[in-house]
Design a protein with these regions (language model features):
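Short, conserved non-catalytic motifs in the polymerase core
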Residues: 14-41, 55-67, 127-148
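Inter-domain linker/hinge segments that demarcate the starts of reverse transcriptase
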Residues: 7, 187-198
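Active-site palm subdomain of RNA-directed nucleic acid polymerases
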Residues: 44-58, 113-124, 143-190
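Right-hand nucleic-acid polymerase module
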Residues: 33, 38, 42, 127-130, ...
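Active-site-proximal segment of RNA-dependent polymerases
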Residues: 41, 45-103
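Short Gly/Ser/Thr- and Asp/Glu-enriched loop/turn motifs at secondary-structure junctions
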Residues: 14-16, 168-172, 204-205
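A short alpha/beta connector and helix-capping loop motif
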Residues: 103-115
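Single conserved hydrophobic/aromatic residue that forms the stacking wall/gate
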Residues: 1-5, 10
Length: 261
């Protein structure tokens, strides 16, 4: 009950402020809740996420406990090494302004397929409808909402209906491996069709290319025999190290960098 009372202020008093950040060259607006609301959202989503994670395919990695970029990158490398003939080509895509363009009614439809408790659904709807359109980039619940939406309308559709063997997703970035360009262009058309159903679009920078060029994904350039960090990540690290004077912050940056390597 105390959590329910706490969550009321998210909508009733507009209890958040906004801050602009820059991430991977993109400017984003974060909605930041009061500490009281953040604790409430975190507690509720800890329970919700445990139920959602059982429904995700194994090759999606964003904001999922015991997964992440390393886990997904290693799975891609393993598949490249185990089936070189079946992974000669790659199709890489990115959903256009995903959080901004997500339809709130589709997200709630997905939540209602999983949860039947009306009190919980009322809270989830408050999280989802924090903004007039889209879902909040900064809200803890949006990670689960986005993953669930794409799990229902894309991940399981590709894996279960079309039997796509080598498909990987990290948030709104996707990768498919295949034995031919023709195979991947067909899968590309299926992905576009699914995104149109939920009013989302794939960015025009999508491409099909030979794996031997290297797969620029998850902050790495991935090849069957080796992986290296993306060049601009190394440049960003060097720039930050030059700018930061605090010894403690330098140690944090170094730990973060070596965590990626």
């Amino acid at each position: 009950l105390s959590l329910v009372g706490s969550e009321m202020c998210i909508r009733d008093r507009g209890g958040y402020h906004e801050r602009e950040i820059e991430e991977y060259g993109k400017k984003r607006i974060l909605q930041i809740l009061s500490m009281k609301d953040r604790i409430a959202v975190f507690a509720i989503m800890n329970v919700v996420d445990r139920h959602l994670q059982k429904r995700y395919i194994r090759t999606t990695g964003a904001s999922i406990k015991r997964r992440g970029t390393h886990d997904l990158m290693n799975r891609i490398r393993t598949d490249l090494q185990k089936d070189p003939e079946g992974t000669l080509y790659a199709y890489k895509f990115d959903i256009c302004r995903f959080y901004d363009n997500v339809r709130q009614d589709f997200v709630m439809w997905c939540f209602r397929r999983v949860f039947k408790d009306e009190r919980l659904l009322v809270l989830l709807e408050r999280f989802v409808t924090l903004l007039p359109e889209g879902i909040s980039f900064g809200l803890r619940s949006s990670q689960g909402a986005g993953n669930l939406l794409l799990s229902v309308f894309l991940d399981h559709y590709l894996k279960d209906k079309y039997g796509v063997r080598y498909y990987y997703r990290y948030c709104d970035d996707g990768l498919v491996l295949g034995k031919s360009k023709a195979e991947l262009w067909k899968i590309r058309d299926v992905i576009h069709g699914q995104m149109e159903k939920i009013d989302l679009e794939i960015k025009p920078n999508e491409r099909v290319f030979p794996v031997e060029e290297g797969i620029d994904f998850l902050g790495y350039v991935i090849r069957p025999n080796y992986v290296r960090l993306r060049k601009r990540i190394k440049q960003k690290f060097a720039r930050k190290m030059h700018e930061v004077k605090s010894r403690k912050r330098r140690r944090e940056l170094i730990a973060s960098f070596y965590g990626m390597t």
